[in-house]
Curated annotation (Swiss-Prot):
Taxonomic source organism: Sulfurihydrogenibium azorense (strain DSM 15241 / OCM 825 / Az-Fu1)
Gene that encodes the chain: hemL
Sorted UniProt keywords: Cytoplasm, Isomerase, Porphyrin biosynthesis, Pyridoxal phosphate
Subunit architecture: Homodimer.
Superkingdom of the organism of origin: Bacteria
Known pathway: Porphyrin-containing compound metabolism; protoporphyrin-IX biosynthesis; 5-aminolevulinate from L-glutamyl-tRNA(Glu): step 2/2
Protein name: Glutamate-1-semialdehyde 2,1-aminomutase
InterPro entries: 4pyrrol_synth_GluAld_NH2Trfase, Aminotrans_3, Aminotrans_3_PPA_site, PyrdxlP-dep_Trfase, PyrdxlP-dep_Trfase_major, PyrdxlP-dep_Trfase_small
Record flagged with keyword Cytoplasm: yes
Modified residues (N6-(pyridoxal phosphate)lysine): K267
Length: 427
């Protein structure tokens, strides 16, 4: 496969962009090759600047649940752009988009739009602290909630990919307010609340972890979290930036039947444009300015382009209700990967929830970050490079999810497994 132009662009990019990229995992550092530069995408496919075609399972890290450049989403953006791209003032689209989120997600009575998932989680944490008048927060080892200071402790995603345990620039005094616990260990949560319960403002969790690779919650885990947080007067925050409108129209909380106090959103709700949101019970959300004392603002928050793209995507998801179809596609890939691994006696674990999948290169069942880290990252890197060479674009990290879209055809899935079989032969 020729990627000469991508290599030239990456070399040039490093003169102007830190590491040649605007987000660390894009540099392909963990998989031992140079990144490909994308020229265009349509449906389930992307094309790089050298003209190579790929079946895409990154989908911009999750937002493109209807595939690349969906005609109706693109048209919605075009129509709005003709009238202006940003006003820094209220628009009717913001109301329509807010109503769509509130109607879809049972626990959300009010919402505030921001520009990224990181902004959403940072704002939700500030709100939880302001509402409860407490300082400490609980997060889980390997869960990634953006790059806000309070949350970039024992994080997943690019932090895990690059093997960074924490990061310089976060004061120890602030980091000490974050209690980090193992995912799926309810006893650890109970113990933490026994020790610090009166000081804990909130628990924030990915209801299905995606940033250490896909890890599902154990049975009754979320209900126990809900019970414990209620008992101690702490807020439960579901970070549904990845899972919201992807695992079900009402998100992971619909799937598991749990009503958190606050929810953060991103990715799917923007239709591929920059967006984030946080929402929850009216009583809590009315602590946010201008109604309440907790300040949060943004020049481009609720901008018309993101609202138009997101609203059209949510409308289509409601009309199509593709979640059973997406689950079936996910199951087909999951079973296919497992069968191939069995053929070659390969030590892998395939974790999946709906249209999110991770193939872990380990013989140990993955239920938390500690078990995820037993994966052979070198073997994953070889698998990644082999699949890329054969036209299958996967996340460039062992600790990320593959995403499916409505645009992925049965032929795409079969071709993916065929190429995977060829790669497992080499491995």
């Amino acid at each position: 496969m020729n990627i000469l132009k991508s290599k030239e662009l990456f070399k040039e990019a490093q003169n102007y962009l830190v590491g040649g990229v605007n987000s660390p995992v894009r540099a392909f550092k963990a998989v031992g090759t140079d990144p490909i530069f994308i020229q265009r995408g349509k449906g389930s496919r992307i094309w790089d600047v050298d003209g190579n075609e790929y079946i895409d399972y990154v989908l911009s890290w999750g937002p493109l649940i209807l595939g690349h450049a969906h005609d109706q989403v693109v048209n919605a953006i075009k129509q709005v752009a003709n009238y202006g791209t940003s006003f820094g003032a209220p628009t009717e689209l913001e109301i329509e988009m807010a109503k769509a989120v509130v109607d879809a997600v049972k626990s959300v009575e009010m919402v505030r739009f921001v520009n990224s998932g990181t902004e959403a989680t940072m704002s939700a944490i500030r709100l939880a602290r302001g509402y409860t008048k407490r300082k400490k927060i609980v997060k889980f080892d390997g869960c990634y909630h953006g790059h806000g200071d309070s949350l970039l402790v024992s994080a997943g995603s690019g932090v895990a990919t690059l093997g960074i345990p924490g990061t310089p620039g976060i004061p120890e005094e602030l980091a000490n307010l974050t209690i980090v616990l193992p995912y799926n260990d309810i006893e650890a949560v109970e113990e933490a609340f026994k020790r610090y319960g009166e000081d804990i403002a909130c628990v924030i969790i990915e209801p299905v972890a995606g940033n250490m690779g896909v890890v599902a919650p154990s049975k009754e885990y979320h209900q126990r979290l809900r019970d414990i947080t209620r008992k101690y007067g702490a807020l439960l925050i579901f970070d549904e930036v990845m899972t919201g409108f992807r695992l079900a129209y009402g998100g992971a909380q619909e799937l598991y039947g749990i009503d958190p106090d606050l929810t953060t959103f991103g990715k799917v709700i923007g239709g591929g444009l920059p967006v984030g949101a946080y929402g929850g019970k009216r009583e809590i959300m009315e602590y946010v300015a201008p109604v309440g004392p907790v300040y949060q603002a943004g020049t481009l928050s609720g901008n018309p382009l993101a609202m138009a793209a997101g609203l059209r995507q949510l409308q289509l998801l409601k009309e199509l209700n593709p979640y059973r179809e997406l689950d079936e596609k996910g199951r087909f890939l999951e079973e296919g990967f497992k069968q191939i691994a069995q053929e070659f006696s390969a030590a892998i674990q395939v974790n999946r929830v709906g249209s999110m999948i991770t193939v872990f290169f380990t013989d140990i069942p993955v239920k938390d970050f500690a078990t995820a880290k037993t994966s052979d990252t070198n073997k994953f890197a070889k698998f990644f490079r082999c699949m890329l060479e054969k036209g299958i674009y996967l996340p460039a990290s062992q600790f990320e999810a593959f995403f499916l879209s409505t645009a992925h055809s049965q032929k795409d899935l079969e071709e993916t497994l065929e190429k995977a079989r060829e790669c497992f032969k080499i491995l």
